[in-house]
């Protein structure tokens, strides 16, 4: 990950224009990318974008509480169809994927805190326990 903040306790404001200007970094499967908005130690908050027709393969975070808020589009996640405005909590050890992405793709805000090991790059973690 590039340009990751690691400044717990410091004020940070990303305007909509700042976030729009951040590059999407490809992770894992084709059509899946993310932007890290904030990171301190092992806590990460970011955005994930999944293009129409793409999917985020099933994976599991054995030691991480995973929170997701869908900001755009629709998809299937943990056996449910969710759309913009939906919130999903995924406890540690629960397999999850993003499938059946709507025609406009989907985008979601995520946060998680790995509890078992330091956070590596998305490429190292993709599809593997965190």
Regions of interest found by a model, annotated:
Residues 77-97:
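Short acidic-glycine-tyrosine-enriched beta hairpin
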Residues 1-42, 123-130:
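A short, N-terminal "cap"/entry segment at the start of jelly-roll beta-barrel domains
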Residues 3-6, 97, 101-130:
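Double-stranded beta-helix
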Residues 62-77:
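Glycine- and acidic-residue-biased ligand/ion/polar-headgroup-sensing regions
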Residues 51-53, 76, 111-113:
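Solvent-exposed residues in well-ordered beta-strands and their adjoining turns
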């Amino acid at each position: 990950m590039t340009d990751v903040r690691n400044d717990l306790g410091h004020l940070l404001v990303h305007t909509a224009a700042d976030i729009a200007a951040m590059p999407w970094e490809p992770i894992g499967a084709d059509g899946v990318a993310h932007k890290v908005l904030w990171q301190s130690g092992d806590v990460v908050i970011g955005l994930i974008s999944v293009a129409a027709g793409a999917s985020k393969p099933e994976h599991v975070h054995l030691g991480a509480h995973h929170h997701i808020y869908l900001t755009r589009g629709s998809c299937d996640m943990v056996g449910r169809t969710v759309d913009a405005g939906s919130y999903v909590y995924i406890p540690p050890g629960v397999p999850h994927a993003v499938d059946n992405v709507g025609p406009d793709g989907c985008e979601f805000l995520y946060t998680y805190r790995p509890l078992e090991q330091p956070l590596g790059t998305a490429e190292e973690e993709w599809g593997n326990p965190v």
